[in-house]
Amino acid sequence: MTPATLAALHARCFQTPRPWSEAEFETLLADPLVFLLVEGDAGLLLGRAVAGEAELLTIAVAPEARQRGLGRRLVSRFLYQARLRGSDRAFLEVAEDNLAARTLYARAGFSPAGRRRGYYRNSAGDAVDALVLRRMLVDAADHGST
């Protein structure tokens, strides 16, 4: 996927928080610490691994492809790639009102580690807290190789 196709998919998946631009994807992909995972043309995940810690930067699954396990596969692959890159822990931020994503992350073993008050804005312009979730990583072999 190119930065343009990544931005187009992201725009189909997000209204709030705002979707990322082609330029933002291009900048991130130029960073050697950032890695991209895709599921066909329906799913993407960007992660970054540095100093023993991996961050799930964004995940997007096309609306018509949801509830088919793509998000679960992307998160599993993120955990595997994070461990391969030397991370022993992972973290992410999720909007408190994004129940589907929170469920996905809880099933993947993430647990609350903090809160960023008013970090996001919803479609009405109201502040929404970001929940910081984290989990420890085990051997990469425990997460599958894809």
Model-predicted regions and their roles:
Residues 82-93, 104:
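Conserved GNAT acetyl-CoA-binding A-motif
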Residues 95, 124, 129-136, 146:
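Conserved catalytic core of the tyrosine transesterase superfamily
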Residues 93, 111-129:
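Conserved catalytic-core motifs of GNAT/GCN5-like acyltransferases
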Residues 58-60, 65, 69, 86, ...:
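Conserved functional loop/turn residues at catalytic and ligand-binding sites
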Residues 3-68, 72-85, 135-146:
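Acetyl-CoA-dependent GNAT
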Residues 71, 75, 97-101, 118-124:
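Short glycine/proline-centered loop/turn elements that form peptide/ligand docking sites
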Residues 105, 110, 133:
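Conserved active-site tyrosine of GNAT-family acetyltransferases
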